[in-house]
């Protein structure tokens, strides 16, 4: 059984009804985690439905596949057009989009056989705020997990791979068991890495800080957008290693990601962050970000890809 979220899924070049998009139980990815994926949003904007940073997401999908040596036959342009097609086919104006490349039923054994191919799907469906409808305004409570992010020489953090998210499951589920909305992972050196499924930012004395990729953080596309928007707003941005206690002493903390968007963190480990609500710097960045879709913020980077172009 599956919870139907839309009518159609793009599956290896064909539009397949949601309930018919099936894979074999012996698919390699089910046994060994051999998949890479993306999370993308389509916003109902002043220009109509637009996919945010579409090309960058599809480039990262192919980059993730390249790191793991997964063959992908579709070009970036073909993947982008397939994405637009599935949004139109499902009559969506606002959606979460999930492209997925996975190794199917190619036989048992950790190493796929020579000449194997991958399967590619793109799903699009309505999905609201990842961490709750009120989280964008009121913020969430987070905890630092007992589970660390893996060292980059064990699991490549630049790849958005399915298997990597078992770590996220441990970080996030531990937090929820203890009554928090989200978990925060440290790297193997004890410095802040990222949230269970989000990048992390701190504000101190008007300066915006975020951990570097060397702290085992995913190169987030929303993270990159925030850095660019913040600089446009005249906010100083520093990428540097951050200690756990810096979260307690920050004026503001927020998480970022395609699903989480820009979600304030009002407490960490039960310690209130700043005033315990969405702070002024976070609010300015939120307004600039969401202003991209209302026209209040100029899209000078060409980040909005119209679905009906």
Curated annotation (Swiss-Prot):
Its cofactor is pyridoxal 5'-phosphate. Its EC number is 2.6.1.42. Signal peptide: none annotated. Pathway: Amino-acid biosynthesis; L-isoleucine biosynthesis; L-isoleucine from 2-oxobutanoate: step 4/4; Amino-acid biosynthesis; L-leucine biosynthesis; L-leucine from 3-methyl-2-oxobutanoate: step 4/4; Amino-acid biosynthesis; L-valine biosynthesis; L-valine from pyruvate: step 4/4. It catalyses: L-leucine + 2-oxoglutarate = 4-methyl-2-oxopentanoate + L-glutamate; L-isoleucine + 2-oxoglutarate = (S)-3-methyl-2-oxopentanoate + L-glutamate; L-valine + 2-oxoglutarate = 3-methyl-2-oxobutanoate + L-glutamate. SUPFAM superfamilies: D-aminoacid aminotransferase-like PLP-dependent enzymes (SSF56752). GO terms for cellular component: cytosol. The modification N6-(pyridoxal phosphate)lysine is found at residue 160. Coiled coil: none annotated. Keywords: Amino-acid biosynthesis, Aminotransferase, Branched-chain amino acid biosynthesis, Pyridoxal phosphate, Transferase. InterPro entries: Aminotrans_IV, Aminotrans_IV_CS, Aminotransferase-like, B_amino_transI, BCAT-like_C, BCAT-like_N, BCAT_family, Class-IV_PLP-Dep_Aminotrnsfr. It is an enzyme of class 2 (transferase). Pfam families: Aminotran_4. GO terms for biological process: aspartate biosynthetic process; isoleucine biosynthetic process; L-leucine biosynthetic process; L-valine biosynthetic process. Disulfide bonds: none annotated. GO terms for molecular function: branched-chain-amino-acid transaminase activity; L-isoleucine-2-oxoglutarate transaminase activity; L-leucine-2-oxoglutarate transaminase activity; L-valine-2-oxoglutarate transaminase activity. Acts on leucine, isoleucine and valine. Homohexamer. Belongs to the class-IV pyridoxal-phosphate-dependent aminotransferase family. This is Branched-chain-amino-acid aminotransferase.
